[in-house]
């Protein structure tokens, strides 16, 4: 508290706020879309229902994951596919592939959104479909992964 007076806020603050923690609050313009979309998003979520949403997300994840596992012994899915606590997210590892390069290739060449996970204990690509992801999009992802596994990326 005694250091507050000397520490400048990032945004302009009145001198009367020198000793007030609120001088660090940002009170600028905030995007209205976030606030305005909440009720529509909740209505959509409730319309689908939690059980159907989770079932759809698991179906999409399992569609690509089980295909890759069946088609290549180099594939490991690090997300437990049989866990009641998992849904859409799948972390896939392929022996011999560099995931930062693979992730960049998938995004730049094929516009497939992914997140390379580079960790001391494990590496892979995090793949996260959403309820509106089509089976054709999932199959395209699996096709491109199989291409990379068999031929490498260029």
Regions found by a protein language model. Name each.
Residues 1-47:
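Conserved core segment of the aminotransferase class I/II
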Residues 21, 85-89, 122-126:
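Short, solvent-exposed beta-strand edge segments and adjacent coil->beta transition regions
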Residues 31-37, 41, 87-97, 144:
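Conserved N-terminal glycine/acidic-rich loop preference
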Residues 33, 38-78:
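Conserved PLP-dependent catalytic core of the aminotransferase class-I/II
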Residues 35-38, 65, 99, 103, ...:
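A general structural signal for well-ordered alpha-helical segments in protein cores
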Residues 58-62, 69-109:
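Conserved PLP-binding catalytic core of the aspartate aminotransferase-like
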Residues 108-154:
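PLP-dependent enzyme catalytic core of the Aspartate aminotransferase-like
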């Amino acid at each position: 508290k005694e250091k507050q007076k000397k520490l400048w806020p990032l945004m302009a603050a009145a001198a009367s706020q020198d000793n007030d923690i609120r001088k660090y609050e940002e009170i600028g313009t905030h995007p209205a879309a976030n606030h305005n979309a909440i009720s529509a998003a909740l209505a959509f979520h409730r319309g689908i229902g939690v059980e159907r949403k989770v079932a759809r997300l698991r179906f999409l994840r399992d569609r690509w994951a089980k295909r890759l596992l069946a088609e290549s012994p180099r594939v490991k899915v690090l997300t437990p596919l049989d866990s009641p606590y998992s849904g859409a997210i799948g972390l896939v590892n392929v022996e011999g592939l560099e995931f930062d390069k693979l992730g960049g290739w998938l995004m730049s060449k094929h516009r497939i959104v992914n997140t390379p996970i580079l960790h001391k204990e494990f590496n892979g690509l995090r793949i996260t479909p959403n309820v509106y992801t089509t089976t054709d999009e999932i199959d395209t992802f699996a096709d491109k992964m199989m291409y990379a596994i068999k031929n490498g990326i260029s």
